[in-house]
């Protein structure tokens, strides 16, 4: 399988445009849930937001095994990333340079930690 670089860049930029400072990740959580469901992932959100004073819980999901033998014999595989971004995390603008580098416009952080991992996972 090869990676579609243009799609990955578009996805990354879309993720960086979602405001997701710590404790205010609701928009990111909703986006991730929507996209994961589109990919046939069974999606859940826990209730940790209530306990920590945030507005979104942890999102987790799984792809069910397609056959009984796979369900019984395959080892689980975990992919993990976080949704929040350090401040200043709102109104981010990604800039794609001619040499392929992606940076912020200088007024905020880019949010590559951890939107880069989320883009790859999706």
Regions found by a protein language model. Give the residues of each.
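N-terminal capping segment at the start of a domain
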Residues: 1-23
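Catalytic cores of large soluble enzymes that bind and process phosphate-bearing ligands
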Residues: 4, 20-24, 28, 109, ...
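Active-site metal-coordination/substrate-binding segment of hydrolases
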Residues: 55, 62, 73-122
């Amino acid at each position: 399988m090869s990676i579609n670089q243009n799609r990955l860049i578009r996805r990354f930029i879309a993720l960086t445009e979602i405001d997701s400072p710590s404790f205010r990740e609701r928009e990111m959580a909703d986006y991730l849930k929507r996209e994961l469901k589109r990919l046939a992932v069974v999606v859940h959100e826990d209730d940790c937001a209530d306990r920590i004073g945030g507005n979104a819980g942890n999102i987790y999901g799984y792809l069910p095994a397609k056959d009984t033998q796979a369900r019984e014999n395959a080892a689980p595989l975990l992919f993990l990333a976080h949704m929040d971004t350090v401040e200043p995390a709102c109104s981010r603008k990604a800039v794609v340079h001619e040499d392929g580098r992606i940076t912020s416009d200088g007024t905020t952080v880019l949010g590559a930690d951890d939107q880069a991992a989320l883009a790859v996972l999706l």
